[in-house]
């Protein structure tokens, strides 16, 4: 299912953005930016395969998936597990993304 491409797209974007975070906030080498930029390019390319009917809706749906993946990143990479409010908020976002992507457009 093409909708699953949002997951690797989110992982690529988060990885790319984290490389900048690591460089600036964690004082890592600027060499961290090289794989980060490659990840951001991969993210942009993957998002073009979205099943959404236009770019704006693709980005809106992606936003819901991005939130889930960001919380997973925080938990697994940065050792900060989500609390119950994070999970409730993420569930709302996921429902919203599903509505935007899959609900019929005609009445």
From Swiss-Prot:
Top-level lineage group: Bacteria
Example of a GO cellular component annotation carried by this entry: plasma membrane
Membrane-crossing segments per the record: 4-24, 29-49, 55-75, 84-104
UniProt cross-references to SUPFAM superfamilies, sorted A to Z: Multidrug resistance efflux transporter EmrE
Keyword Cell inner membrane assigned: yes
Protein keywords: Cell inner membrane, Cell membrane, Membrane, Transmembrane, Transmembrane helix
Membrane disposition: Multi-pass membrane protein
First-listed, main subcellular location of the protein, grouped into a coarse class: membrane
Database matches in InterPro entries: UPF0060 (IPR003844)
Subcellular localization(s) per the UniProt record: Cell inner membrane
Family per record: Belongs to the UPF0060 family.
Protein name per the record: UPF0060 membrane protein ZMO1566
Organism of derivation: Zymomonas mobilis subsp. mobilis (strain ATCC 31821 / ZM4 / CP4)
């Amino acid at each position: 299912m093409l909708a699953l491409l949002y997951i690797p797209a989110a992982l690529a974007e988060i990885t790319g953005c984290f490389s900048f975070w690591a460089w600036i906030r964690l004082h890592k080498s600027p060499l961290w930016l090289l794989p980060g930029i490659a990840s951001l390019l991969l993210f942009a390319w993957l998002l073009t395969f979205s099943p959404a009917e236009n770019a704006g809706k693709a980005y809106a749906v992606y936003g819901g998936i991005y939130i889930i993946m960001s919380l997973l990143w925080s938990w697994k990479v940065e050792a900060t597990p989500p609390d119950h409010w994070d999970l409730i908020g993420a569930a709302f976002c996921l429902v919203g993304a599903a509505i935007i992507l899959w609900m019929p457009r005609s009445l």
